């Protein structure tokens, strides 16, 4: 991948349960629970408290970023924004990036994350030409790790004591999926 504008196009990715579309400032009210829920903050290892004006500014700027892709996850059945899926930390020379996904509490456990992950990761490999997509998941989030494994991610190693949370050191597992593995999954599934 040599086109430095590869992330400039912000697509809409339709699925059966969800639609991923470019996130906007107007999505902030629906996404506020991501920044207010103590359990979400713990599971994502986020120590920072965000105020709504700062979030509005952040989300308003996402469409102009040419080094990342921030998409809102919209539940088809309700039309409600229930989370976000992001490809970021793009390494152009090595055709790789990081992935993160997060949902408001009442959207968890209904298959929305599985489909959203398949949509954005598939886009990364099939449309953007990435070779590797990686993530980190904390040891106290086994549910997310199982979801990532289900989506085809493989554990590569452990970052020992990567997070200090409430006085305790927490390991993070590095996981990734490679383009050939993704293609083989598609052929098998």
Predicted segments with their positions:
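Conserved GNAT acetyl-CoA-binding A-motif
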Residues: 126-136
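A structural signal for the main folded, soluble domain(s) of proteins
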Residues: 125-126, 179
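A cross-family signal for key residues in well-ordered alpha-helices
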Residues: 32, 118, 122, 176
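GNAT-family acyltransferases
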Residues: 1-107, 169-170, 177-189
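Conserved phosphate-binding and hydrolysis motifs of nucleotide-dependent enzymes
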Residues: 83, 141, 152
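Conserved catalytic-core motifs of GNAT/GCN5-like acyltransferases
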Residues: 23, 134-137, 154-174
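Conserved acetyl-CoA-binding loop-helix of GNAT-fold acetyltransferases
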Residues: 109-124, 142-150
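Amphipathic alpha-helical recognition patches that constitute DNA-binding helices
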Residues: 30, 98, 102, 115, ...
């Amino acid at each position: 991948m040599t086109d430095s504008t590869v992330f400039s196009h912000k697509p809409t990715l339709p699925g059966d349960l969800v639609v991923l579309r470019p996130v906007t400032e107007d999505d902030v009210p629906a996404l506020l629970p991501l920044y207010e829920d103590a359990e979400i903050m713990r599971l994502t290892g986020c120590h920072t408290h965000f105020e709504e004006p700062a979030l509005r500014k952040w989300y308003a700027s996402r469409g102009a970023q040419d080094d990342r892709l921030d998409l809102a996850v919209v539940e088809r059945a309700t039309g409600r924004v229930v989370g976000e899926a992001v490809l970021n930390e793009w390494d152009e020379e090595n055709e790789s990036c990081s992935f993160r996904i997060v949902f408001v509490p009442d959207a968890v456990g209904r298959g929305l994350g599985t489909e959203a992950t398949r949509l954005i990761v598939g886009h990364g490999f099939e449309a953007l030409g990435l070779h590797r997509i990686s993530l980190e998941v904390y040891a106290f989030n086994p549910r997310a790790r199982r979801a990532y494994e289900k989506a085809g991610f493989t554990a590569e190693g452990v970052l020992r004591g990567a997070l200090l949370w409430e006085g305790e050191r927490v390991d993070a597992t590095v996981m990734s999926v490679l383009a050939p593995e993704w293609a083989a999954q598609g052929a098998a599934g």
